[in-house]
């Protein structure tokens, strides 16, 4: 309250702040008690104390960060004094009128840090002061953030083993809560039934679908919108507002409620394209009571998401694609596969509204040799991999965006190729969000040779010719060169369908080639205006 900063860690500029003094700790504890009392006055039944993830209470408990020589350092009992001071202050103020859920890292997952054994010992000290032991993991001050907030390379429930260890210790007698990329009700029930926890929590899963618990309760698990772990929700500071890739209403629920009007009559809606944007449009139009027909030229739905079936770390995208496909069927959308839409065909259907979701094409940069027989696009790479076609052992990927990085990992991790990736800019996957990018780069370092600040000057049957800003030249041997240099919207193809109905709107990649979030947002917005 005096405006001075205190910390145990070095901030982003390398500056060290003074350590907490006992009087400051006492003021902080009193502030926690004030907040608890305010919560009680507002009608809350429970509060959560965040004592994990490298935050200040976690720092005090960590032998790696707490190197104090006074009464608050050294033994676990000493390191626990500040958290206990806070819990005592809260209990003295509100008694047992509020439940306290205490969040703690079951392990910091770092050398010399807080361990699961430390966690159990601490919980033994405080279990008479709290009501729920909430077991998370990791720390912001180690390279574990992408495990603490599980990324798409990790399985669902990946951190549940820590809560299970706490439960199996038989030393903790209060309910134990686990979390970590849970969303499927069956996995939650199994975790509880096998003694892994008493409670299971979701965070991102209730952002992608706030009604997920209610849907599970009423036997509608198939309608739960699956989280794809893209972290657009957590990294919203980079965007204009809090958002979710798979639920376009998140962060703007109130505004949409004011703007959206129920349709005055049932209309005949034609959607062209069965990728995520087209399927979202068809779903929303059907939910609004319209008659919807979706035309897709391929023999399957999903668009480019279909390739997620080939890559384990894209399982979350496969889950979302399957959800959309299932909901189209459940909502009664007529789907015509292997049907290439033409203006004449669509006009004959006498639509009241047309939504074009015709996608995008790979950018083919003007590089000598780019049309050689050994050059393929990322999409063709996945198709060849699925068909088992030979691409050789040495493969070069041109482009270090998200598509290029994921394609390189697919080739290296699943097809066991020797992969080299080149990127003109200073880093790879720069458009990705911080936590998934951390996991992505970790895997690239293990499986792929990456060169940044390098451009391709030509492609020959022997491989890729490259140069850097210093004038150095080299040839990267490659049997196949994979292009991942971006996507170009099929805007012209989409415009062919304008004028066939009173309402027309292009959506998804044919407007701007972006990502799942852009696809679902534009698809939702278009259909909600019909």
Listing of model-derived features with the role each one plays in the protein:
Residues 44, 130, 197, 328, ...:
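Local beta-strand N-terminus motif with an aromatic residue
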Residues 263-295, 336-350, 357-371, 379-432, ...:
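Rossmann-like dinucleotide/flavin-binding elements
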Residues 51-54, 66, 138, 205, ...:
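Short, ordered loop/turn segments at secondary-structure junctions
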Residues 1-272, 276, 280-292, 363, ...:
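Flavin-dependent oxidoreductase catalytic cores
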Residues 49, 134-135, 202, 356-357, ...:
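Redox-cofactor binding/interface segments in oxidoreductases and associated redox assembly factors
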Residues 321, 337-340, 377-379, 452-454, ...:
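Short loop/edge segments at beta-strand edges and connector loops
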